[in-house]
Amino acid sequence: MSKTRIYEVAKELGMNSKELMEFLEKELNISVKSHMSTIEEETVQVIMDLIEEERQTKKEVKKQKEPSKEKGKSSEQVKVKEKSKEEPVEEKFLREVTITSHDLSLDILAKQIGLEQNDIIKDMFMKGVVLRPGQKLDITMAENIAMNYNVILNFEIEKKETEEGKEQDIEAILAKKWNDIYEKEKDKLAPRPPVVTIMGHVDHGKTTLLDKIRNTHVADKEEGGITQSIGAYQIEYNGQKITFIDTPGHEAFTEMRARGAQVTDIVVLIIAADDGVMPQTIEAYNHAKSANVPIIVAINKIDKPNANVELTKQQMVSKLNLIPEDWGGDTITVLVSAKTGEGIDELLEMILLVSEMQEIRCIPDGKARAVIIESRVDKAMGPLGTVIVKDGILKVGDDFISGSTYGRVRRLINDKGESLIKAVPSTPVQVLGFNDVPNTHSILYVIDSKEEARTLAEKVKEKEEEKSKGPAKRHVKLEDIMQKMEEEEKKKLNILLKASTYGEIEALRNAIQKFENPEIDIEIIHAGIGPVSTSDIMLASASDAIVLGFRVKADSKALKMAEAEGIEVRRYNIIFDLIDDIKKALEGMLEPIQKEELTGNGVIKEEFKIKGVGKIAGVQVNEGYVQRDGGVRIYRNGGLIADVKIKSLKHYKDEVKSIEAPKECGIQFENFEDFTKGDELEFYKHVFVKRELGLEQKTK
């Protein structure tokens, strides 16, 4: 008989799994473990009939509650009786409640009208409406729910939004202000230097190429041969400036790369002539493509003996759909050698040419707007933010806001370590003067005064805190009420993450999220910058988490506490090692896969009937072996007649675990005796294989 999963039945009934499970236990005394449990088709039909009957009964009861005339009683007596029996009808629309927010959820509505959220859920369920704790409500739904409790909702939202909306959406207003300036003063816009990002596969020569342009040597000093954080540099070529953003090379740093592309005007996609188009090449191309950024391809390592430029171009066409100009396409392709410097000048010329074609413009003066591409805390200088100025002039002494942080520019430092008085558009500078570490990817806006900046930043922070608190509270309710059974089934890995910069945090978070799996919940309970501290260990202990540090130290007190508490602390300098360890940990948590393995074959030579035991097959093992806890497929004239388990395996009179070819044995099959001499046997066993998890396994 066929079976159906709980969640499928719930979906058909317009319920959620938790509600159906409660109904089964209460009404039918059927206990199921989870939403993935199965029930017989017969039971499904019974459930559907019961719920439909219950819903129908509720409708009839509602109809019967209509006021009716009663004979032999005075009108006054009738009214008194009706009032006592049908009080909700008599008091309908007697109470009004004012709502002042669009952000209305079921728990908030329940509080506003003076009821328990669970009572509303039960009442509405009996009316055929399924609600969930903390569920978001639109105006119509909220009004319908309230009407069931004789409540009218008065929505006074427009006025509130007019008065408070501006304060709540500070960043949107600042962004709109700049967009309006662009629209109104197009004739005043001026050219600015292009911001270029070099992208590509790991070890294809990005850092070496950038170093050749800047005449520096960074790559040899870096651990693991890859860039460890985002940097921005500016060079001058033929009297024109070009700003470069150097992004990490490993594919795990997709978030860093995406952030780099967002502030980028031009992407240089680097491909090694001796390696061709690789996975990270495709990934980098997709980021540039989604950002709608023009792409210049630099085919690097042309100095190597095994360089194959033509094959690389073929792969550009087949894997990226980029057709080089010399092949009749429109993709500018430059042959370079980051090692010898060949082709570098041509690459810079092409960058300036594309920049001219793109007509990259900015507001050349006035208050500045800049993009934060990196942030960190320096022991001596405090919170720092690396920015690229997009518009206006950023000056020492300027007051600014950046998300929920604010400050006054105390110092500007360029990529050469020089202090500047001001920074013009496309200039990368490090800004000192933040009150706290700013979020990477946020926008810095210069404001009239520090007081105004502080006020605006505090309002942004309040809004962020409200957002973080709201969903968190509802999440706890959902877990407590609806998802407990899922948590009992799923395994969970809690991680506390520490790194040296926010850029690394974002990139590592992105890499870890790629390992999400239906069987395992991965939760980063905390992510911060700086050394691993005692407070981190305390949090990890309370949350049963592992502590992962990337390019950070750990306090000696923290390490002692971790040892005492039994908390695992691992620190890494190379991203590959960290990701590999997480992958191994998750693979160890996955249930192994059961696979079938053929062990041998044989033929039935004789049949024996033993009183009180049953029919036994006398078997000749031809190849391999047969084992007692294995299975057997029985074939007759080439066709499969049975697939059975082995009940007993004997060699002469002895019960044995296995028999190898070319020995003979006696086999009793489990619940099967319809065999005969000449039947062919195929022996197999089930083995458990450890599962592997790849970066590509993304389920959400």
Swiss-Prot record:
The keyword Cytoplasm is assigned to this record: yes
Cellular component per GO, a single term: cytosol
Cystine pairings recorded for this chain: none
Pfam families recorded: EF-G_D2, GTP_EFTU, IF-2, IF2_N
Residue ranges of every copy of the tr-type G domain listed in the record: 191-365
Region span, Disordered: 58-85
Binding positions (GTP): 200-207, 246-250, 300-303
This protein's record includes keyword Nucleotide-binding: yes
Molecular function via GO: GTP binding; GTPase activity; translation initiation factor activity
Region (G3): 246-249
Major localisation: cytoplasm
Chain segments carrying region G4: 300-303
Domain of life: Bacteria
Region of interest (G2), residue spans: 225-229
Alphabetized HAMAP family for the sequence: IF_2_B
General function of this protein: One of the essential components for the initiation of protein synthesis. Protects formylmethionyl-tRNA from spontaneous hydrolysis and promotes its binding to the 30S ribosomal subunits. Also involved in the hydrolysis of GTP during the formation of the 70S ribosomal complex.
UniProt similarity note: Belongs to the TRAFAC class translation factor GTPase superfamily. Classic translation factor GTPase family. IF-2 subfamily.
Name of this protein: Translation initiation factor IF-2
Gene: infB
